[in-house]
């Protein structure tokens, strides 16, 4: 492992010890904000320090074992220990490099998931419903919580557009690579002649930002319209103007919310989604500027970026970003999408490591 990496790990270990002492300090314990910040930093260093300590111990064990190589009675055992430890050290060094990669501060946040039907008419709406079901089942398997923010159902089933909030551990970090164009190839239920059609939906995943990180939105930049809810809501449907539509005039972003019976709650939900979309627009602008310099697995943010195809006749799913194909379409549509998500994350980390090597 490079001396520069070892030096950085030594510094992180020292900081970890310093934080441990600070968290036992009475003045820090009395200051909730400071205690919370130090606790968070301490927790973030736990894994890298523990892994580094294991790496140091294995290297120390190898040095001790090498001293026994001249002893005929101990040579075989020492050689075996050295071989095993070197293999583990190699794995630890790869893991440490990944742990040292720059972290996306948004990864730990909850996420807004937006699915919008694209080309393909009614079939696109049905596919949007299929995608929503897929992500819902995946969220359930992770014990994440799903809360509907806004839904516009299509006539033949499914959705013209649906926005949900998914809450849980590192939701955005797991789902952020799902943003882009999703294409389906199959015989629609409405097709009488058995012809295969191609339809598409766009998926956008945005982090739910804490209030402290939300962009300042000038109220003068907003147009807020209220109207009667057309969705579920029992006796309150179409009796009060509880639904809210907010237009951000500078960007043209429009957010609607009618899920709650309370206009106040719908407005709060819509503003939260709007803030995330405004931040996303800025991130997309930056991504477009960087797109020519290095492959960007997160995409440029362009909703037309085709990232995945679901081919029903062949029972396959293909991720076009890394040329990955799996022939378990039924399982994927039932929420078993880790085998699609994890390879993308791994590839992204490999790209980050390559970028760091280029800079070295």
Curated annotation (Swiss-Prot):
Peptide chain release factor 1 directs the termination of translation in response to the peptide chain termination codons UAG and UAA. It is found in: Cytoplasm. PROSITE patterns: RF_PROK_I. It comes from Haemophilus ducreyi (strain 35000HP / ATCC 700724). Methylated by PrmC. Methylation increases the termination efficiency of RF1. Belongs to the prokaryotic/mitochondrial release factor family. One of its GO terms (molecular function) is translation release factor activity, codon specific. InterPro entries: PCRF (IPR005139), Pep_chain_release_fac_I (IPR000352), Pep_chain_release_fac_I_sf (IPR045853), Prokaryotic/Mito_RF (IPR050057), RF-1 (IPR004373). SUPFAM superfamilies: Release factor. The modification N5-methylglutamine is found at residue 235. GO terms for cellular component: cytoplasm. This is Peptide chain release factor 1. It comes from the Bacteria. Keywords: Cytoplasm, Methylation, Protein biosynthesis.
């Amino acid at each position: 492992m490079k001396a520069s990496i070892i030096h950085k790990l030594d510094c992180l270990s020292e900081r970890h010890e310093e934080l441990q002492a600070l968290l036992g300090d009475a003045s820090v314990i009395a200051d909730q904000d400071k205690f919370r910040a130090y606790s968070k930093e301490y927790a973030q260093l736990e894994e890298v320090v523990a892994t580094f300590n294991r790496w140091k111990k294995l290297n120390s064990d190898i040095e001790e074992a090498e001293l026994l190589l001249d002893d005929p009675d101990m040579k075989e055992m020492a050689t075996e220990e050295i071989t095993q430890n070197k293999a583990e050290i190699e794995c630890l060094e790869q893991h440490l490099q990944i742990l040292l990669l720059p972290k996306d501060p948004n990864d730990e946040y909850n996420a807004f998931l937006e699915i919008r039907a694209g080309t393909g008419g009614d079939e696109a709406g049905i596919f949007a419903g299929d995608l929503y079901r897929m992500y819902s089942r995946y969220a359930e398997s992770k014990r994440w919580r799903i809360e509907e923010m806004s839904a516009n159902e299509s006539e033949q089933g499914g959705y013209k557009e649906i926005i949900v909030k998914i809450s849980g551990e590192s939701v955005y970090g797991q789902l952020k690579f799902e943003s882009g164009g999703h294409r389906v190839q199959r015989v629609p239920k409405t097709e009488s002649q058995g012809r295969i059609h191609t339809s598409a939906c766009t998926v956008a995943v945005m982090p739910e930002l804490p209030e402290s990180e939300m962009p300042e939105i000038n109220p003068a930049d907003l147009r807020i319209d209220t109207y009667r809810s057309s969705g579920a809501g029992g006796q309150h449907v179409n009796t009060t103007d509880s639904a809210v539509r907010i237009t951000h005039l500078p960007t043209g972003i429009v957010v609607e919310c009618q899920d709650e019976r309370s206009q106040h709650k719908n407005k709060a939900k819509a503003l939260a989604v709007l803030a995330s979309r405004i931040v996303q627009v800025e991130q997309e602008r930056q991504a477009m500027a960087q797109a020519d310099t290095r492959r960007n697995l997160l995409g440029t943010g362009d909703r037309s970026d085709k990232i995945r195809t679901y081919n029903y006749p062949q029972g396959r799913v293909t991720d076009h970003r890394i040329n990955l194909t799996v022939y378990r379409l039924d399982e994927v549509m039932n929420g078993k999408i880790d085998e699609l998500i994890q390879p993308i994350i791994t590839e992204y980390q490999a790209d980050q490591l390559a970028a760091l090597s280029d800079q070295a």
